[in-house]
Structures are given as structure tokens and as C-alpha cells.
Amino acid sequence: NFKNHFDENELKKRIENYTLKIIQIQKLHQAENCYIVASELISGLIHNNLRLQNNLDLMEQFKTVSLLFATMIQDLSQYFNNVYVYTVEGNHSRVVAKKEDSLQGENMDILLPFYLQAKLQNYQNVHIQ
């Protein structure tokens, strides 16, 4: 829109800044564990006009977000004893436009833990719920 520029480069920059802020908080408070609750990570198929405005299709969004999120978790795992990751099924990640027509589980957010468990399986202090 005219007030805000957002693309995958901006997303990467924002996630990197957010990660640095979390690390600063960890250092300040000597936090041992990090808890991440994630939802609404992509713009699904709920509004056709929004879908057409997105510069990445649904699958590219998921791949981009999954890689960036995994990198964030990898970075945080170096500073915390444990990193616990929870994902919550959101409304915007639906794969069906009409909420009434959507079946339980038809949501891209549900795929994220599956991907993260495979990607981060060798990180003993990362726990994907």
C-alpha cells in the first residue's frame, strides 16, 4: 500500500531485527528458555484481491517464511538453553476463501511444525510442539 512497503527483503530485515531484540532481552535478563508462539505467518487464500496483490504465491510464501523462521530459531538456540516453538492455526493461513467451507486442518500454519521438526532435528535444545 502507499504507507508501507513490504516484500521478502523487508520480511527478512524485520525478522533479523526482531531476533536481535530477543537476544538483547536474553542477555539483559539472563533468560534460560525462549518460548515462541507463531501464527498468521502467511497470507492465505481468504481474499482474492489480497491474493492477487501478494508478490509471492502461497507456496513461495510458505517456503520463504519457513526458511526465515527456521534461521531465527537456529540463531536463538545459540543463546538459550531451550527454545520451545508452538504454532497456532490462524485465520489468514486458510487455503479456502470462505471460512464456512474450510475444513479443520486446511491451513498452511499446520505444515510449519512438520517442516521445522525436519529442518531442526539436530538441534537438541529446540522443541517443536
Specify the residue positions occupied by each region the protein language model found.
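Extended recognition/assembly regions associated with phosphoester-bond processing machinery
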Residues: 1-129
